[in-house]
Regions:
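An N-terminal assembly and electron-transfer interface module characteristic of large anaerobic redox
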Residues: 1-309
Length: 309
């Protein structure tokens, strides 16, 4: 398919990417969109196992997903793939009955959501309103369910078809799924040149630029983290520098092939945040990830005896 362009998300120039230019406005929106997507995932997975009305969490997710699409793509410049890769699709859940659908509609009406056609004027307003509505969603007053984290190779971690719908299985078995966000992977990629400059004599200018890049990326989700922490209900993303420090107790930060040390760091972060049960999912042929994933399990179990990986 010679006419099909492949756009590489790489600063190393592996692909020429003809006709594709990353502008500052595009980069700004891309970072905001990743932050918003990570936040939506965190909100949905936290409340869905406890929803008072079956289907209300998915309906609320759909509402804010549409608001997000309208905010980031007001002129329909980009194709909307949200129906193709839909996080609220649960294989094994029966469709809502008319009575259940009515109760879900009533539950969302009680939240006082803005009209679907109303424009959101700022990213801060979009995130604040989204968090507030998920925090206000009526939940069952039951004991916290066992929490199961999902980490691994970036495709297998996020794509339901690649991980055999792990989230659906976890929730069907009466547990709560926890999936760390996508933004952290980009922070991991940005952090690696800093280590290489210090220990391998690589470019100090590149390392300095990466330090500033990390500060910039972290700034994009700073307000989201603040609002999530105010609720006291949702898991918070960790600083990539803190994750690197914690991973150093198990392996060298020089392990940067594939997901590298970041894979181990995510498992440590989950365990220390009350998620001792972890699915570490890899493609069969991804040897670097088997080394820093399965290869680290023995040491993680030694340091964290309550872990179940």
């Amino acid at each position: 398919f010679p006419k099909v362009a492949v756009v590489a998300l790489s600063a190393q120039g592996f692909e020429a990417n003809p006709g594709w230019k990353i502008t500052l406005p595009f980069l700004n929106q891309a970072l905001q969109a990743v932050c918003y997507g990570d936040m939506l995932s965190t909100l949905l997975l936290r409340v869905r196992p406890y929803e008072a009305e079956r289907g209300s969490a998915n309906a609320l997710y759909q509402y804010w997903n549409k608001k997000g699409v309208a905010f980031f793509n007001p002129k329909n410049k980009y194709a909307d793939l949200s129906d193709t890769y839909n996080m609220d699709e649960s294989c094994g859940n029966d469709p809502l009955t008319p009575e259940e659908a009515t109760r879900v509609h009533d539950a969302l009406t009680q939240l006082g959501l803005p009209d679907e056609e109303a424009k959101v004027r700022s990213f801060t307003r979009l995130t604040d309103d989204t968090i507030a509505s998920f925090d206000a969603l009526q939940l069952r007053d039951i004991k916290r369910k066992p929490r199961v984290g999902i980490v691994g190779e970036i495709l297998v971690k996020f794509q339901p078809d690649a991980n055999n719908h792990a989230i659906d299985v976890i929730e069907r078995e009466g547990c709560e799924a926890v999936v760390p966000g996508l933004l952290d992977f980009f922070l991991y990629c940005t952090y690696n040149p800093i280590w290489r400059a210090e220990y391998l004599g690589r470019s100090s200018k590149v390392a300095w630029a990466c330090e500033r890049g990390i500060d910039l990326i972290e700034h994009y989700r700073k307000h989201i983290v603040k609002k999530l922490s105010e609720t006291g209900k949702f898991i918070l993303p960790a600083s990539i520098r803190d994750m690197a420090n914690s991973a150093e107790s198990v392996l060298s930060i020089g392990n940067s092939c594939g997901e590298g040390w970041f894979l181990t760091a995510e498992m440590i972060e989950l365990i220390e945040n009350g998620v001792p049960n972890i699915i570490c999912a890899q493609p069969f042929a991804c040897l670097p990830n088997h080394v820093t994933g399965k290869g680290m399990i023995k040491e993680l179990r030694r340091q964290y005896p309550n872990s179940n990986i």
